[in-house]
Swiss-Prot record:
Keywords: Cytoplasm, Glycosyltransferase, Purine salvage, Transferase
PANTHER family noted in UniProt: ADENINE PHOSPHORIBOSYLTRANSFERASE
Entry's Gene Ontology molecular function annotations: adenine binding; adenine phosphoribosyltransferase activity; AMP binding
Top-level EC class: transferase
Location, primary (coarse class): cytoplasm
Stored InterPro entries: Ade_phspho_trans, PRibTrfase_dom, PRTase-like, UPRTase/APRTase
SUPFAM superfamilies: PRTase-like
Gene name tied to this protein: apt
Subunit structure: Homodimer.
Membership in a protein family: Belongs to the purine/pyrimidine phosphoribosyltransferase family.
Protein name: Adenine phosphoribosyltransferase
Cellular compartment(s): Cytoplasm
Alphabetical list of Pfam families matching this protein: Pribosyltran (PF00156)
Annotated source species: Methylorubrum extorquens (strain PA1)
Length: 181
């Protein structure tokens, strides 16, 4: 049943070759999100391992992590914490820079979004290099969070981001894998 559910989810993801540049296959989850059954299955699958447990906050990475993370937080009766690109949050923040293929970027979180000891799940749509997710885990830990898991709809295992998080001691849950970049 679980394998069939994840196969149907995988079929709901649109693959766009040579976007944003030649040689890349973009995995577009907007088709999954727009299909009520697929969206529900994805959220239910992300929630299932943590239902009935104590999760204080769900942190979502901008932008699709907001959609998924908000739905997960709602089902877990947890709070939701946005992790945004620098300059997008109105209150006092802490931030961290991380490497991109060409240059760096920076994400931030409100300083009062997490209380020390909060049990937090990190949610995003896809893990590739793990750069943004690693930076998010570091921010959450800096504020005293216990990062229970990092959850993604899609993993691109050849790129190694999920393993990078595991090397930091983070449990990683994904719903499907795609080969390539």
């Amino acid at each position: 049943m679980e394998a069939r559910r994840h196969s149907a989810l995988k079929d709901s993801v649109r693959s766009i070759p040579d976007y944003p540049k030649p040689g890349i296959i973009f995995r577009d989850i907007t088709t999954l999100l727009s299909d009520p059954r697929s969206f529900r299955r994805a959220v239910d699958s992300l929630v299932h391992p943590y239902a009935g447990g104590r999760i204080d906050q769900v942190a979502g990475i901008e932008a699709r992590g907001f959609i998924l993370g908000g739905a997960v937080a709602h089902q877990l009766s947890s709070g939701f914490v946005p992790i945004r690109k620098k300059g997008k949050l109105p209150h006092k923040t802490v931030s961290t820079a991380y490497a991109l293929e060409y240059g760096t970027d920076e994400i931030e979180i409100h300083v009062d979004a997490i209380k020390p000891g909060d049990r937090v799940i990190l949610v995003d749509d896809l893990i590739a290099t793990g750069g943004t997710a690693t930076a998010a885990v570091n921010l959450l830990r800096q504020l005293g969070a216990e990062v229970v898991a990092a959850c993604f709809v899609i993993d691109l295992p050849e790129i190694g981001g999920a393993q990078r998080l595991r090397d930091l001691g983070v449990t990683v849950r994904t719903l499907m894998e795609f080969e390539g970049h």
